[in-house]
Amino acid sequence: MSDEICEVVITGPDADWLAEFTRMLVADRFAACGQNITAIRSIYRWQGAIEDATEARVALHTRRDLVPAIVERADHDPPYAVPCVIALPVVDAAPAYARWVLAETKPT
């Protein structure tokens, strides 16, 4: 079991889809919480064309060793052919907050 926490960023097609996906991850204890940001503007290259789309984004706080399970969930419930899921290390956090994240997520 790892005591390292991280932030996992996921984008989705809209706020409703992403809120439901976040709720599922929190309910199943894959994430302690998720802060959803709606109406972000994404500009990216896809299949040879430049796309300009409105999306939603969530920042999940979780254990580092749960990231593969979150990636697997995103791959199995995808709104996109190539879902955006990235994990960023948390270099430092308030000790009480880090303990809370660990307590609210399931140990592997």
Go through each PLM region and give its residues.
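Positively charged, small/polar-rich N-terminal and surface patches that mediate targeting and assembly
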Residues: 1-108
